[in-house]
Amino acid sequence: MSVKVEVIEGGVPHQKIMIAGLVATIVCLYLSYLNVYTNTAYFSFFGGLAVVAALIWGSNTIKVLCSYGIGTGVPSAGMIAFGSGVIAMLLATKFGIAAPIVALVLAAVIGLILGYLSNEVLNMKIPVMIQSLTELAVVGALTLMGFAVLITGSFTFTGLTTGSVTLFGMISMPSYQVSFIGGGLVAVAFLLGSIAVQHPFNACLGPGWKQDRMLMLTAECGFLSMIVAAVMSFALVSMIAGIISLLIALIGWVYTYTQYIELSKRDAAAWLDSKPIPDVEGH
């Protein structure tokens, strides 16, 4: 049996956030396909923006799910989102330009199955469990695909598994180790996303919870993760493409961080300018 914690209700309805997050994520992923038409990686930053949009949606989904009193389930929700999402993302990359849509469908099916097992087999009996795990699986899959685009410039299987090394500055040879999957970057993306999606609600929950503050923190965590991914992208895309992604990530992070601090000041009972602990001699 579960009890819903009504104190955290309010703000923008979850359905609106879900629709906006899904549409924004899919649009950004497809805008990154401009890399193919221009034969560059300059539009890889759209993958990072897709990550931020998906994380905002996922963070609010975790809030809805964990409103039923499963506090320790917040980190677990982030992990199951990406654990199920990575399966859908990897399978979907074999479908070329249709990969984002295929990832969405596959992840939804996986999440639906996990939600059913959680409620009916594990007997958790949480009313929103099936819908929430379905959403989180989709969020995990699309977030990982966004990181893949940001780091490699592509969301196709070939782009994620094949890199190249240059010998003597002249001869370029394919190398599967220098790639998103072969180089283990998918594991880093997994952790960046799973932490970013579950941390904001954990940090903002309580009687003073406000939706706008939590979602602003989510965006800040998203851009912070984008900075890390943009730095990693220098190994796989051109320097110009990496710099573009890094600059956009830095601008987004500075803006969202300052906004989050302002919202924290707004909601705090008091904001004290504490001083360093004095170093008293003889103690």
Model-derived segments and spans:
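Hydrophobic, membrane-facing alpha-helical anchors
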Residues: 1-6, 47-65
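Cytoplasm-facing juxtamembrane segments at the starts of transmembrane helices
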Residues: 3-22, 68-78, 120-149, 203-222, ...
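Generic alpha-helical transmembrane segments
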Residues: 46-56, 106-116, 177-199
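Alpha-helical transmembrane segments of multi-pass integral membrane proteins
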Residues: 80-89, 106-116, 133-157, 183-185, ...
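Alpha-helical membrane-embedded segments
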Residues: 109-113, 183-193, 227, 237-261
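Juxtamembrane/interface segments at transmembrane-helix termini
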Residues: 121-125, 157, 194-205, 238-241, ...
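Short, highly charged, low-complexity non-transmembrane loops/tails of multi-pass membrane proteins
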Residues: 212, 262-283
